Amino acid sequence: MLFRSKGESDAGPASGIPQPHPYRDGELPDSVRVACASNGGERLDGHFGSCARFLIYQVSPAEARLIAVRPAPTIARLSVDHSVERVSLIADCALLGVLSIGGPAAARVVNSGVHPLKRSEPAEATLFLDELRAVLAGAPPPWLARIVGREPAAVAAA
């Protein structure tokens, strides 16, 4: 049995699993790979440690494309630490969208090179991805500019 955090969808694996679209590396310039913790449909509505799946998107200023759906292992809360296996599912991503993530798991995610971004409420993943696309289209913060291979915008002298 999976335990859900406040706000997490209880839809589970039976709800509609979205279909990924073909993608070849380099096809979307200035893009970043993003994992979203999901329990149902194309929603960002999961806790890192208990979500049913990770939706993997390639996101550029022009497009957010679902490129993979990776089922997460089903675990019981008292099992041996399972965050290592979950981190391996998203290791090729630069960003992780989640409703919540525990401290030790967040440390493992960050140490693997993935930057977790917590959301306060469950929502369609497209809302999160559209916000990210807008940031990429403008002047992203230096850490994000480096991830997509752009020079960080120079800070104007005061």
Regions from the PLM with identified roles:
Residues 114-118, 126-158:
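C-terminal binding/interaction regions
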Residues 25-29, 47, 88-90:
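Solvent-exposed alpha-helices and their adjacent loops that cap or buttress functional pockets
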Residues 31-81:
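Conserved mixed alpha/beta catalytic, RNA-binding, or beta-rich assembly cores of soluble enzyme
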Residues 68-98, 104-106, 115-123, 138-139:
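Compact, charge-rich alpha-helical regulatory domains located at protein termini
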Residues 7-11:
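A general sequence property marking short-to-moderate contiguous segments
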Residues 109:
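Extended, alpha-helix-rich binding/interface surfaces that flank or overlap catalytic cores
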Residues 6, 16-42:
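Entry/capping segment at the start of metal-dependent catalytic domains
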Residues 1-2:
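Short, small-residue-biased leader/transition segments that mark boundaries at the very start
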